[in-house]
């Protein structure tokens, strides 16, 4: 089963969940119309299962849906965007 990705703005993060279990998270700060991604982590038991990719894709899809820009300070988010050029348009040009 593919995890669901949910924005948890009060915690400043997107979570990948399987029911009540958090499989991964990507932390962010909002700065105006920019979402600054600062850190991503995946539960060790879920590593290598695609949770990180599902998480970043879901977070960036949400950024796009809200007309925002992404600032990938997190190396995982940055490398994911580099491997998925169809998301490169979301990256704030000042980064």
Can you annotate each of these PLM segments?
Residues 21-29, 36:
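Conserved beta-strand in the GNAT
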Residues 1-7:
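Conserved N-terminal entry element of GNAT/NAT acetyltransferase domains
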Residues 15, 34-36:
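General beta-strand recognition
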Residues 48-59:
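Conserved acetyl-CoA-binding loop-helix of GNAT-fold acetyltransferases
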Residues 41-47:
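A short, internal acetyl-CoA/4′-phosphopantetheine-binding micro-motif in the GNAT/acyltransferase core
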């Amino acid at each position: 089963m593919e995890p669901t990705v949910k924005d948890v703005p009060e915690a400043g993060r997107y979570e990948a969940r399987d029911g009540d279990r958090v499989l991964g998270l990507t932390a962010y700060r909002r700065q105006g119309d920019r979402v600054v991604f600062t850190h991503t982590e995946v539960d060790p038991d879920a590593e290598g299962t695609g949770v990180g990719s599902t998480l970043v894709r879901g977070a960036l899809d949400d950024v796009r849906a809200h007309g925002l820009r992404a600032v990938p300070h997190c190396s995982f988010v940055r490398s994911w965007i580099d491997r998925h050029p169809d998301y490169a348009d979301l990256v704030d040009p000042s980064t």
